[in-house]
């Protein structure tokens, strides 16, 4: 039987307690990976994966989490930088606190999620990093200047890491989801949700599991062994 080659690979997913992160954790477990996830709380219901309470905005917190994960599961092969937040408003109304919160989680948080693991990947000459960007990081979105800027930054970060890591056999890619059915998008007002749906050629929002499969592909040492520095769009042709 064909396999993505993720069996027994140790993979860390940040923001893995619910939503897209939880779907990624579940799928990777089903593929035989040894999965750990970090979040501000680990009570989302997945009792099989190793949950570690950690804050992606705090490098010391993530370094401590990395030590615990490595001690319990072994050397880490893959990191999925999924944790993210929004603080939406029109540009003139965005406060310094709105900017700082989103930059700290969505951009610095991605760097701090990767940093504790990457030197080990370089030493072992194997590893795959996948960061969750967004359709907003490529096309922008009204009321999301801060969010869009961070998600564009994530793409730039992965492209740079891909160039740095190539000589060590370490790949770095981004997944850019469109509108996905999560707690975040379910909070969108119904009339706005209907308007967005009509703009999507598939005429529906995506599912967290569809993002999880894209992540699994990019993590795979079999299916995507020569893929690095790329952005995989999963948006139902909303942005091509």
Curated annotation (Swiss-Prot):
<dbReference type="GO" id="GO:0016616">
    <property type="term" value="F:oxidoreductase activity, acting on the CH-OH group of donors, NAD or NADP as acceptor"/>
</dbReference>
<dbReference type="InterPro" id="IPR002347">
    <property type="entry name" value="SDR_fam"/>
</dbReference>
<dbReference type="InterPro" id="IPR049956">
    <property type="entry name" value="PhaB"/>
</dbReference>
<dbReference type="Pfam" id="PF13561">
    <property type="entry name" value="adh_short_C2"/>
</dbReference>
<feature type="binding site">
    <location>
        <begin position="18"/>
        <end position="20"/>
    </location>
    <ligand>
        <name>NADP(+)</name>
    </ligand>
</feature>
<feature type="binding site">
    <location>
        <begin position="177"/>
        <end position="180"/>
    </location>
    <ligand>
        <name>NADP(+)</name>
    </ligand>
</feature>
<dbReference type="GO" id="GO:0042619">
    <property type="term" value="P:poly-hydroxybutyrate biosynthetic process"/>
</dbReference>
<dbReference type="InterPro" id="IPR020904">
    <property type="entry name" value="Sc_DH/Rdtase_CS"/>
</dbReference>
<feature type="binding site">
    <location>
        <begin position="178"/>
        <end position="179"/>
    </location>
    <ligand>
        <name>substrate</name>
    </ligand>
</feature>
<comment type="similarity">
    <text>Belongs to the short-chain dehydrogenases/reductases (SDR) family.</text>
</comment>
<dbReference type="GO" id="GO:0030497">
    <property type="term" value="P:fatty acid elongation"/>
</dbReference>
<dbReference type="InterPro" id="IPR036291">
    <property type="entry name" value="NAD(P)-bd_dom_sf"/>
</dbReference>
<feature type="active site" description="Proton acceptor">
    <location>
        <position position="147"/>
    </location>
</feature>
<feature type="binding site">
    <location>
        <position position="134"/>
    </location>
    <ligand>
        <name>substrate</name>
    </ligand>
</feature>
<keyword id="KW-0583">PHB biosynthesis</keyword>
<keyword id="KW-0560">Oxidoreductase</keyword>
<feature type="binding site">
    <location>
        <begin position="141"/>
        <end position="144"/>
    </location>
    <ligand>
        <name>substrate</name>
    </ligand>
</feature>
<protein>
    <recommendedName>
        <fullName>Acetoacetyl-CoA reductase</fullName>
        <ecNumber>1.1.1.36</ecNumber>
    </recommendedName>
</protein>
<dbReference type="GO" id="GO:0018454">
    <property type="term" value="F:acetoacetyl-CoA reductase activity"/>
</dbReference>
<feature type="binding site">
    <location>
        <begin position="82"/>
        <end position="86"/>
    </location>
    <ligand>
        <name>NADP(+)</name>
    </ligand>
</feature>
<comment type="function">
    <text>Catalyzes the reduction of acetoacetyl-CoA to (R)-3-hydroxybutyryl-CoA. When expressed in E.coli with Synechocystis PhaA, PhaC and PhaE confers the ability to synthesize up to 12% (w/w) poly(3-hydroxybutyrate) (PHB) depending on the carbon source.</text>
</comment>
<keyword id="KW-0521">NADP</keyword>
<comment type="pathway">
    <text>Biopolymer metabolism; poly-(R)-3-hydroxybutanoate biosynthesis.</text>
</comment>
<dbReference type="InterPro" id="IPR050259">
    <property type="entry name" value="SDR"/>
</dbReference>
């Amino acid at each position: 039987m064909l396999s993505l080659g993720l069996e027994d690979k140790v993979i860390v997913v940040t923001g893995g307690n619910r939503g897209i992160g939880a779907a990624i954790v579940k799928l990777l477990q089903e593929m035989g990976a040894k999965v750990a996830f970090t979040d501000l709380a680990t009570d989302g219901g997945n009792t099989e994966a190793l949950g570690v309470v950690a804050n992606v905005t705090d490098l010391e917190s993530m370094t401590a989490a990395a030590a615990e994960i490595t001690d319990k599961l072994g050397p880490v092969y893959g990191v999925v930088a999924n944790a993210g937040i929004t603080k939406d408003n029109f540009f003139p109304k965005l406060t310094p606190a709105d900017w700082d919160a989103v930059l700290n989680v969505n951009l610095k948080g991605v760097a701090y999620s990767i940093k504790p693991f990457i030197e080990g990947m370089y030493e072992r000459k194997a590893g795959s990093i996948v960061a969750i960007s967004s359709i907003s990081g490529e096309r922008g979105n009204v009321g999301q200047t801060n969010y869009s800027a961070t998600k564009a930054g994530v793409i730039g970060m992965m492209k740079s890491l891909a160039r740095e890591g190539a000589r060590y056999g370490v790949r770095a890619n981004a997944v850019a989801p469109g509108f996905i059915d999560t707690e975040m998008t379910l909070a969108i007002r119904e009339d706005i949700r209907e308007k967005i749906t009509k703009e999507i050629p598939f005429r529906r929002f995506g599912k967290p599991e569809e993002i999880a499969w894209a992540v699994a592909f990019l993590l795979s040492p079999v299916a995507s062994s020569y893929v690095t520095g790329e952005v995989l769009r999963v948006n139902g042709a909303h942005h091509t």
